[in-house]
């Protein structure tokens, strides 16, 4: 199960990136096997996949680079988690990740916090967004197709500028040693 919705025209240039993001997860799966998923390793791993997807979409991406941060007390040195650029547009991204239970997908506060952090990245005139990766889990057994569809429906209720999700069939039974099943990943983007 895979899809994307872009609600903000300024982020339309990310459509091929979000499509190739799932392809990058599939490539990882081909090499690492069904017992390992890149998206449960945290924000840095997911940022790397999104950067790889940008390059595959013939855009440019740069992770973890030094730059100016804007705060009330003025400008200071900081870092940006990711930038994605086309010939016409550049997006500066602050990234975070959450691992909620499948039935508890209210990520509104986490998305607002991530977008607030993104406001400090780059200059006020530059396009900025918070990117929240969501790796939902379920205890004891894998998620049914109906539960995954409910999850996607819940994701679409968020006031995000762009939403992408990928719940690959190969990972439907992926779980850790605690019996937590991680069926896939979603990405919420909110312009700062």
Language-model features: where?
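Interdomain/boundary linker segments immediately adjacent to catalytic/signaling cores
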Residues: 1-49, 53
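Catalytic lumenal/periplasmic loop and adjoining terminal transmembrane helix
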Residues: 49-55, 97-101
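Catalytic cores of nucleic-acid endonucleases
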Residues: 95-150
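N-terminal cationic-hydrophobic initiation segments that often serve targeting/anchoring roles
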Residues: 55, 118-122, 156
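Residues at beta-strand starts and edge strands
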Residues: 78, 89, 180-183
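A short acidic/basic microdomain associated with nuclease active sites
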Residues: 54-75, 80-85
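Glycine-rich, aromatic-bearing surface loops/beta-hairpins
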Residues: 127-192
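Conserved catalytic cores of phosphodiester-cleaving nucleases, focusing on short active-site segments
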Residues: 80-103
């Amino acid at each position: 199960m895979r899809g994307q919705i872009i609600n903000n025209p300024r982020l339309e240039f990310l459509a091929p990136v979000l499509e190739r993001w799932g392809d990058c997860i599939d490539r990882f799966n081909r090499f690492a096997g069904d017992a390992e998923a890149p998206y449960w390793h945290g924000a840095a791993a997911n940022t790397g996949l999104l950067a790889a997807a940008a390059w595959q979409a013939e855009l440019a991406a740069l992770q973890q680079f030094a730059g100016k941060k804007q705060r009330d007390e003025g400008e200071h040195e900081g870092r940006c988690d990711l930038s994605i650029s086309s010939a016409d547009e550049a997006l500066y991204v602050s990234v975070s990740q959450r691992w909620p239970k499948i039935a508890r997908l209210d990520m509104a506060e986490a998305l607002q916090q991530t977008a607030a952090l993104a406001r400090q990245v780059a200059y006020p005139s530059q396009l900025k967004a918070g990117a929240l990766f969501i790796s939902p889990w379920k205890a004891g057994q894998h998620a049914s197709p109906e539960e995954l569809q409910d999850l996607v429906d819940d994701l679409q209720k968020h006031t995000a500028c762009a939403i992408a999700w990928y719940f690959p069939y190969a990972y439907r039974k992926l779980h850790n040693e605690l019996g937590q099943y991680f069926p896939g990943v979603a990405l919420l983007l909110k312009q700062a």
